[in-house]
Regions:
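Noncatalytic linker/hinge segments flanking ATPase motor cores
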Residues: 44-52, 159-165, 182-189
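Conserved phosphate-coordination/catalytic loops
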Residues: 81, 85-89, 164-173
């Protein structure tokens, strides 16, 4: 198996996956990211607390949702924003054509060689799931958010807690998880001691 592992923003997407969210809620992205970039220093100074600069933006999204700036923002809504992303030319065609290329090659057929595409991103997993590339992707690693009842709207939910994160360091962990095939075999984890022959995808 040949695994092709992609980043998302500015790699597949022309811009950032949060852009349609800011546009929908009339939030200035420049001001938002300036606020986010100041948070690590602020929390260290005020509370002597270190935060992860790669994922602190998730806290800010949750804060905005609770304050009503991102009114009604939940996982379903995040997924809907995936359909509004603008991909670079050739995306998602490259995923389909690369699979077809190997599937139609006699030598690849003989040795059962195939290609799988993965996305590892510090962005929202739900946004990726709602995008046009998802049907071509074997699996994704991204940030996941937990919902809670929306205090501002009865019967609705909003993003409320952080469930899972990927940052620039744990992207390496994701690569090892793909290597060992933990997404295909629940009995295997990233710390499992597997020989090279036992690993689903070789480096």
């Amino acid at each position: 198996i040949i695994a092709v592992i992609w980043d998302f923003d500015k790699t597949l997407v022309d811009g950032y996956m949060q852009d349609p969210i800011f546009e929908e809620y009339n939030i200035d992205p420049k001001n938002f990211w300036e606020e986010v970039n100041k948070l690590p220093e602020r929390y260290l100074k005020e509370q002597d607390v270190k935060v992860n600069p790669d994922t602190i933006y998730l806290n800010q999204f949750i804060k905005y949702a609770k304050e009503g700036k991102f009114a009604g923002l939940n996982n379903d809504k995040l997924k809907e924003f995936g359909s509004k992303l603008k991909f670079y030319p050739g995306i998602p065609d490259i995923f389909r054509t690369s699979k077809e290329l190997l599937a139609n090659d006699p030598a690849c057929k003989e040795y059962n060689i195939k290609v799988e595409h993965y996305i590892v991103s510090t962005g929202f997993a739900q946004v990726i799931r709602g995008s046009s590339v998802m049907e071509h992707i074997e699996d994704i690693w991204g940030c996941e958010l937990i919902e809670a009842p929306d205090p501002n709207q009865e019967g609705c939910s909003i993003i409320s807690e952080i469930g899972f994160t990927i940052d620039n360091s744990t992207k390496t962990r994701a690569i090892f998880e793909i290597n060992k095939g933990i997404n295909k075999n629940q009995d295997v984890n990233v710390n499992s001691n597997l020989s090279e022959e036992q690993r689903r995808i070789s480096f």
